[in-house]
From Swiss-Prot:
Localization per record: Cytoplasm
Function summary: Involved in the biosynthesis of the central metabolite phospho-alpha-D-ribosyl-1-pyrophosphate (PRPP) via the transfer of pyrophosphoryl group from ATP to 1-hydroxyl of ribose-5-phosphate (Rib-5-P).
Positions that bind ATP: D37, G38, E39, R96, Q97
Residues annotated as binding Mg(2+) 1: H131
Protein name, as recorded: Ribose-phosphate pyrophosphokinase
Designated gene of the protein: prs
Origin organism lineage: Bacteria, Pseudomonadati, Pseudomonadota, Gammaproteobacteria, Enterobacterales
Pathway: Metabolic intermediate biosynthesis; 5-phospho-alpha-D-ribose 1-diphosphate biosynthesis; 5-phospho-alpha-D-ribose 1-diphosphate from D-ribose 5-phosphate (route I): step 1/1
Co-factor(s): Mg(2+)
């Protein structure tokens, strides 16, 4: 069996180190930096010939820089005769550009990125909670899309929730919310119907379901500006919700996210470590982070040993 080696770019160094610790190994020796003009510079400083290589790199902000780091690292490892290269992308950027609505003159950038990664020599992709699962079909190589829900669920069960109800912040998240509700002792579910007048601006319309006197658990795949969740929480509290907890896998926290969350009525925001948090977000008392390092380490181990990934999520 080829030697398994982990490498990491500059996007998620803490998560990469946690994964390495879980696997009782160390990160590979690679210098990933910049030339004086800003171009990505990569130097692999150890033998990887024939190795089973995993590159841990989210394509979060700065998205283009982190994507280019990943691509250039793949090329460097491929030219160094790596046996198999798996791109471990905890957060897959550009995933929201996955279709042309009403044949609008826009790109399907998720497909462009998938082609880019395939063309430079990625043999396999491991990612977490793709914004749209069908993005897996954009790739010409195997994609393992694992879920953060078991980690989130474990935390929910420790919250001492009183008469909980799982809430989807929009119609598109119903499937995710239903799955969480089923695992959370088959609890009830509510849906927030909203309309989005323009990008990153959400207007809550009304709530489908009875939330009065209950602990509400909002679940989503990501938090961007936080506008959706904060307005959803306001609507829930107006309808008599007792407490509101917001759970999401990917903490993008762009734009006015810090102010939105600081001034919101959300009791606690719980996210995963697929994207590093800024100092401003870390300073917020109602934001807490869970690590996916154990789950990703197990997925990497299974891929390296040719074991089933889907078996991790069988209940």
């Amino acid at each position: 069996m080829p030697d398994m080696k982990l490498f990491a770019g500059n996007a998620t160094p803490e998560l990469a180190q946690r994964i390495a610790n879980r696997l009782y190994t160390s990160l590979g020796d690679a210098a990933v930096g910049r030339f004086s003009d800003g171009e990505v510079s990569v130097q692999i400083n150890e033998n990887v010939r024939g190795g089973d290589i995993f590159i841990i790199q989210s394509t979060c902000a700065p998205t283009n820089d982190n994507l280019m780091e990943l691509v250039v690292m793949v090329d460097a490892l491929r030219r160094a005769s790596a046996g198999r290269i798996t791109a471990v992308i905890p957060y897959f950027g550009y995933a929201r550009q996955d279709r042309r609505v009403r044949s609008a003159r826009v790109p399907i950038t998720a497909k462009v990125v998938a082609d880019f990664l395939s063309s430079v020599g990625v043999d396999r992709v491991l990612t977490v909670d793709l914004h749209a699962e069908q993005i897996q079909g954009f790739f010409d190589v195997p994609v393992d899309n694992v879920f953060g829900s078991p980690i989130l669920l474990e935390d929910m069960l420790q919250q001492n929730l009183e008469n909980p109800i799982v809430v989807s912040p929009d119609i598109g998240g119903v499937v995710r919310a239903r799955a969480i509700a089923k695992l959370l002792n088959d609890t009830d579910m509510a849906i927030i119907d909203k309309r989005r007048p323009r990008a990153n601006v959400s207007q809550v319309m009304h709530i489908i379901g009875d939330v009065a006197g209950r602990d509400c658990v909002l679940v989503d795949d990501m938090i961007d500006t936080g506008g959706t969740l904060c307005k959803a929480a306001e609507a829930l509290k107006e309808r008599g919700a007792k407490r509101v907890f917001a759970y999401a896998t990917h903490p993008i926290f762009s734009g006015n996210a810090v102010d939105n969350i600081r001034n919101s009525v959300i009791d606690e925001v719980i996210v995963c470590d697929t994207i590093p948090l800024s100092a401003e977000i870390k300073a917020l008392k109602n934001v807490r982070t869970l690590t996916l390092s154990g789950m990703l380490a197990e997925a990497i181990r299974r891929i390296s040993n040719e074991e089933s990934i889907s078996a991790m999520f069988e209940h």
